[in-house]
Amino acid sequence: MCKSRTMFLAAFALCVVAAIAVRVDAQQSAPAQKDSIAFQDHVNAAKLLAADDLTGRNLLDCTMPPQSAAPTGKPVTAPPTRVFDQLYYLGTDIVASWALVTSAGIIQIDSLDNPEEAQRIIIGGYKELGLDPSQMKYLVLTHGHDDHYGGAKYLQDTYHPHVLMSTPDWDMLAKLHDSRPGFGPPPTRDMDIADGQKLTLGNTTLTFYLTPGHTPGTISFLVPVTDKGKPHLLSFWGGSALPRTLEPGAFEARATDMGLLIYKRSLERFIKIGEDGGADGFIANHPYRDQTFIDGKNDKITKNRMREPGDPSPWIGRSTYIRYMMIALECNEAQIGWIQAGKPQVSQ
């Protein structure tokens, strides 16, 4: 990508984000109205923001109706990888988990699909990376879907971390009767997360924000890390897949969706939180979203392994982070506009 185009995209993204505060004030309290911009214009904006490096599965959110961004087929296990000085990736090409090492123990983020994956990929990864599973003090679950909590009961019963999830999603899981084949049961309810709540372990503090949309109580947060001693702040958006309807619970196949309108308000709020906090990178709980692990050839784990001294981390880049978040917002706007327009047939 030419330098001038990169500079234009960065400037464009910054200008759009600067307008978020105004949009939030105007839209959070306003009734749903038909978008004044045609939904296809939002799709085009997302494609522009994607440029050459954020194309692919993230843009599937902009298809009408939206397609699943998840890869199909048997999951491929990623090599356990030290991503930053204190952050480690443990997952597959479909779902992620992260270990955040502090001066007083480990904060584990998400737990994969089931006990077998948690034991083989998370605990096996700990041991391969020289981490001690007994130092897992907290297990943070980004939301109450089984591809994120499926291994939690095993970790809870075996290593006894405190398990944290938002109050709305704990309540949602309390109504769950049966586990899906291939996925583990919910953990025993332990600690509830409220909006703005802080978790401090040793020298690390995370502040959690309730960002309903993907589920009633999806949480998002900023992760402080260092790369070879240099500090960075990563944005972690906790629920990437878009709802299918405007209002909560209207799509039977995904009854936990809170609707596109609520999702949009949460996303706008968290973008502003990231901007105010100075986020300069991002990670996700699905690796095809942040391109942490795709195929072992053209992903960030591979690029990180091939870094030369002085090269920046592939997870860091303020412009890229902003464009990633704005693609999600544009696709959300496109889906709202498409539904409000009566779901017309669209050539993809």
Where are these regions (language model features)?
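Bacterial N-terminal signal peptides
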Residues: 10-19
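Conserved beta-strand hairpin/beta-sheet module of binuclear metal-dependent hydrolase folds
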Residues: 73-129, 221-247
